[in-house]
Amino acid sequence: MIGRRQLVTVFRRYASQNGVIGQDHTLLPPLMLYRRILRAHKLLPPMQKEMGDKYVKSEFELHRTIDNPLHIVGFLASWQDYLHQITNGKWKEGSLSPAVLEKMSPEQVGQLYELMKETEKVTKGDNPEEDKGKNKI
């Protein structure tokens, strides 16, 4: 893992060139960001909190050993944007720009589509597990 000072330098250079986040935001260290996200999840409904906690924990664990500074910066910047969405209450209104969608692989787009469909089922009250139980009676 690279040092914090080197990481911040790379992040500032990358952010200024690509407009990742505004000038008033600074990059949070990974552990602090992780803890703030988990605290912010307490504001979510129980189902979203549970799903969010599991996802955040697995993603941070998977990215623990990354050494590429640009990957680290992109990862932390994306999660910091997510944190701002949750703390501002805009998590339900989030949408992807066409530019972000174009950068995704076909596999990622497929996963996103499946997630969208499952989310729609939950918000509409359709629960396939409940339906299976009803058919057995």
Swiss-Prot record:
Protein name per UniProt: Succinate dehydrogenase assembly factor 3, mitochondrial
Keyword Metal-binding: no
Subunit structure, interactors included: Interacts with the iron-sulfur protein subunit within the SDH catalytic dimer.
Mitochondrion as UniProt keyword: yes
UniProt subcellular location: Mitochondrion matrix
CDD domains: Complex1_LYR_SDHAF3_LYRM10
Similarity-based family: Belongs to the complex I LYR family. SDHAF3 subfamily.
Stretches the record annotates as Disordered: 117-137
GO cellular component, one term: mitochondrial intermembrane space
One Pfam match: Complex1_LYR_2
The entry's keywords: Chaperone, Gluconeogenesis, Mitochondrion, Transit peptide
InterPro entries noted in UniProt: SDHAF3/Sdh7 (IPR008381)
Role according to the record: Plays an essential role in the assembly of succinate dehydrogenase (SDH), an enzyme complex (also referred to as respiratory complex II) that is a component of both the tricarboxylic acid (TCA) cycle and the mitochondrial electron transport chain, and which couples the oxidation of succinate to fumarate with the reduction of ubiquinone (coenzyme Q) to ubiquinol. Promotes maturation of the iron-sulfur protein subunit of the SDH catalytic dimer, protecting it from the deleterious effects of oxidants. May act together with SDHAF1.
Transit peptide: 1-15
GO biological process, one term: carbon utilization
